[in-house]
Amino acid sequence: MLSLVALALMSALWWALIALPRQADTPYPLGPYNQERCPLPGEGSGTFKVLVISQLLAKPLAQALCHEPALTGRFAQVEVSWQARGELSAADIMERRYQLLWNRDYVLTGLVPRYHQYLAELLALPDYQVYLLGREPVVLSSAAFAGKRLGLLSDSESQSGYQLPLHALNDAGIKPEPGQLRFFRERRQLQAALAKGDVDFITAIAAKGHTPWFDPAKALLIAGKVPAGAWFIDSRLSRDKALSETLVRHLEAAMKAQLARPW
C-alpha cells in the first residue's frame, strides 16, 4: 500500500511514471488533449472509462490498461480522461459514465447521497501532509513574506494546492499583496517555477521515504493528516475480484512512481 496519494489526486498528480508493469515495446497511439484512448484486442464492447484529475497520470495509466488482459474481451477500448474535480456531476455518477475514478467520499455524497449504489470503494488512500517548500527555508510571518511570491494551483477546490496554503497565510495574519500569489495549472509547473526562481516558495505534498527530491530543511509543514480520498470502481465491476485486484496493482504502481518524482 502507499503512504500518500496523489491526485487530486488530486491531482493533483499528477507525473511521468516509471514503475508501471512492463508494457509491450510499441505503445498504442493515444488521443486528444484531455483524453488518452486506445483500442483493446478481441471482441469486447463498450469503453472502460477512467477519470483522473491530472494529465500526468493519464497517459501511463492508459498504456498499462491498454495492455491489460483482464479488460480484453470485455471492453473494446480504454479511455482515460482528466478534468477539474468540480466538473464531476451527479449525472456522471448515476449514468455510470466512468468505470474507475478518484474522489473523496464527502464530494460524492454531496453529488449523490446514495452514490454507493453506483460506485464501490476500490482503493482507500492514506492521509498525507501539506508543506510550503521554498528556495530557502520557509518562515511564515508578515515580515518574511514581504516581497515574496507564492505558487499555488489555479484549482480553487484543491485542498493541498490552493485552500490549505491560503488558510495558513490567514492563520499567520498575512494578507498577500497583488502579484504575490502566482497560479499554475499543474504541480510540475509549480516545481519548475520554483526551480527557475519565478516564485519563492510553492505548496507541496510529500511522503516520507518516497520523495528523494523533497528537502525538509526548506519546507514548512502547514497541514498534517489530510484525507486523500479513494479510487472507486463501477459497483457492477466490483464483484469481479480478479479485475479489482488487477486495477489496484496498476494504480499502486502508478502512484508509487509518481511519489518518487517532483510534484
Regions found by a protein language model. Give the residues of each.
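Structural motif
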Residues: 51-56, 103-105, 135, 154-156, ...
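Bilobed "Venus flytrap"/periplasmic-binding protein-like clamshell domains
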Residues: 45-70, 129-186, 191, 262
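Periplasmic-binding protein-like
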Residues: 43-46, 124-134, 213-254, 261-263
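N-terminal hydrophobic or amphipathic helices and topogenic motifs
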Residues: 1-97, 249, 253-263
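Short, hydrophobic alpha-helical packing/hinge segments within bilobed ligand-binding/sensory domains
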Residues: 86-92, 187-193, 199
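Acidic, polar ligand-binding/catalytic clefts
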Residues: 22-28, 85-144
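Sec/Tat-exported extracytoplasmic proteins
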Residues: 69, 97, 105, 136, ...
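A ligand-binding cleft/hinge motif common to bilobed small-molecule-binding domains
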Residues: 102-114, 193-226
